[in-house]
Amino acid sequence: MTTDTEWQAWGIRDPYFAVLTNPKYRTDALTPDAKLEFLASGRKTVEMVLNACRGYFGAHFAPQRVLDFGCGVGRLSIPFAAEAREVVGMDVAESMLAEARLNCQAQDCHNRSESVV
């Protein structure tokens, strides 16, 4: 089995756990609250990254375009979409991108696109 095939299988079987390996993110244990916590962890990570960038480039730093390579279910793409004009999420697994699309629709982000690599 190739790694691409493995990621496709993870995306079908256990997409959130494949991104953050905490048992509460397993498909059979994922509650609505756990999913919200999962997505909130992405927002915290994006805030940390943007704060670091602003420390280097100045408080005015605002990304125009973001590439989320290995975007999985959109954990980082979605909060980046609130900050940037355009976000592109790329992943080797169509199953992960399908879940990212659902999450993106639920979060009402329209400036995000994706593709399989």
Q: What are these model-derived regions, one by one?
A:
Residues 62-70:
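Conserved class I S-adenosyl-L-methionine
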Residues 27-44:
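Short, contiguous, helix-prone interaction/anchoring segments in small proteins
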Residues 1-32:
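N-terminal, positively charged/glycine-rich alpha-helical extensions of SAM-dependent methyltransferases
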Residues 1-4, 42-46, 93:
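A structural signal for well-ordered alpha-helical scaffolds and beta->alpha junctions
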Residues 40-63:
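Conserved alpha-helix/loop element of class I SAM-dependent methyltransferases that forms part
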Residues 67, 75-117:
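Class I SAM-dependent methyltransferase SAM/SAH-binding core
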